[in-house]
Regions:
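Acidic, PIN/NYN-like endoribonuclease modules and their adjacent C-terminal/linker elements
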Residues: 77, 104-132
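Alpha-helix capping/helix-boundary segments
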Residues: 10-11, 39, 86, 104-105, ...
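A secondary-structure boundary/capping signal
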Residues: 7-8, 36, 102, 121-122
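Short, well-structured N-terminal submotif of metal-dependent ribonuclease cores
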Residues: 1-35
């Protein structure tokens, strides 16, 4: 069973409109959805209206939330300060995948495994995993 850590941009995009393609993550079988309060709050503050925030709150009820501990970044990994809590929380949640659309900061790590976590875009994961 895959444990998927959803980055803030995935949460934001899923909540942005009621027909968002990323809602497919909530219909996948044999997965556990994970994220962090940090990512959830980042998504929430970037959503512009109450309907979007309401969708985000409903989606969040089906996600296990984790926080990063004060551990160090893995050797050789360079991320901006604001993105470090995402990877660290994914590590603490013992996820199998970090799902992110952040090409700028996580792009160099796409397709690579860090501390047992495969970094992929939403489309990369969904290509090989079908909803129920």
């Amino acid at each position: 069973m895959d444990r998927l850590f959803l980055d803030a941009n995935v949460l934001f995009s899923a909540a942005y409109r009621s027909s968002a393609g990323l809602l497919r993550f909530w219909n996948l079988k044999n997965v556990i959805l994970c994220s962090s309060h940090y990512a959830l709050e980042e998504a929430r503050i970037n959503l512009s209206d109450d309907a979007q925030r309401g969708r985000l709150a409903r989606l969040a009820r089906k996600i296990q939330l984790f926080e990063s501990t004060a551990r160090q970044m893995p050797a050789g990994i360079s991320l901006p300060e604001k993105d470090r809590p995402i990877l660290l929380a994914a590590m603490d949640a013992r996820t199998t995948h970090l799902i992110t659309g952040d090409l700028r900061h996580f792009g160099p790590y796409f397709g690579k495994t860090i501390e047992g976590i495969l970094i992929v875009t939403p489309s990369q994961y969904l290509k090989t995993h079908q909803p129920r």
